[in-house]
């Protein structure tokens, strides 16, 4: 039995993801050992975002392929990584006074924003449905918790529950659609799927068509696109104001 070759992994191309993950965990650990003054957590979070933005420019010979082509760093993904880091940094800065006033536990708050940024970076560089699904779920789970981070606020709890239930509903559609597309094309890579569709004209086949429809429905719910946006007003109203601003910008751009 021949051994399965390991996919090529370029750690430099993964630098923004690794940096954000490390700093997200660093924020959580630091929060356990400091007193009431949590200002150092803001500094750590912003430093992590700055280093991630800088590290996204570490590769000059673009595009760079990793994980057997499932993760691609090109000029577009570098641009969006920079945009995501800026939007996350702004979300942290506008949250400082709000968190103090509302008594929010900032360790979890800042780390979740960093982990959400990890998911957005994955989405911007993904060329495989499995990687896309992974990025979407990292973003979604982070936002579920951020929406309900005001645990004593009933509106925040309601927003988090609605967001979680509808998000799980959308995930089911998304995953089922990806499964049908994989069954029709035999691949999860977007480039191969596009090639199979163009060469074999299978877009009109029932299995493929149903997969595309379910995929559109799942993405529509995730990005609050019409007519799948009915959950957005209630969730945006109940979530903390800085979280609402963050949800309306970065994750939407990443999904699109």
Feature roles, as predicted:
Residues 1-256:
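Alpha-helical transmembrane segments of multi-pass membrane proteins predominantly involved
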């Amino acid at each position: 039995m021949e051994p399965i070759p390991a996919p090529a992994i370029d750690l430099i191309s993964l630098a923004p993801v690794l940096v954000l993950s490390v700093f997200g965990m660093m924020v959580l650990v630091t929060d356990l050992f400091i007193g009431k003054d949590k200002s150092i957590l803001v500094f750590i979070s912003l430093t992590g975002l700055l280093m991630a933005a800088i590290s996204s420019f570490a590769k000059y010979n673009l595009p760079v392929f990793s994980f057997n082509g499932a993760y691609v760093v090109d000029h577009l993904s570098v641009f969006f990584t920079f945009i995501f880091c800026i939007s996350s940094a702004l979300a942290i800065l506008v949250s400082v006074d709000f968190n103090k006033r509302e008594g929010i536990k900032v360790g979890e708050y800042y780390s979740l924003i960093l982990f959400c940024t990890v998911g957005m970076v994955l989405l911007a560089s993904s060329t495989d449905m499995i990687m896309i699904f992974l990025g979407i779920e990292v973003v979604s789970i982070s936002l579920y918790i951020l929406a309900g981070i005001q645990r004593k606020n009933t509106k925040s709890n309601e927003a988090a529950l609605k967001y979680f239930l509808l998000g799980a509903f959308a995930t089911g559609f998304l995953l089922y659609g990806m499964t049908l597309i994989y069954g029709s094309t035999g691949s999860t890579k977007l480039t191969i799927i596009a090639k199979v569709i163009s060469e074999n004209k299978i877009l009109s086949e029932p299995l493929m068509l149903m997969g595309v429809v379910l995929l559109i429905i799942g993405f529509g719910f995730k990005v609050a696109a019409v007519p799948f946006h009915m959950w957005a007003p209630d969730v945006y109203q109940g979530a903390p104001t800085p979280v609402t601003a963050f949800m309306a910008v970065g994750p939407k751009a990443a999904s699109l």
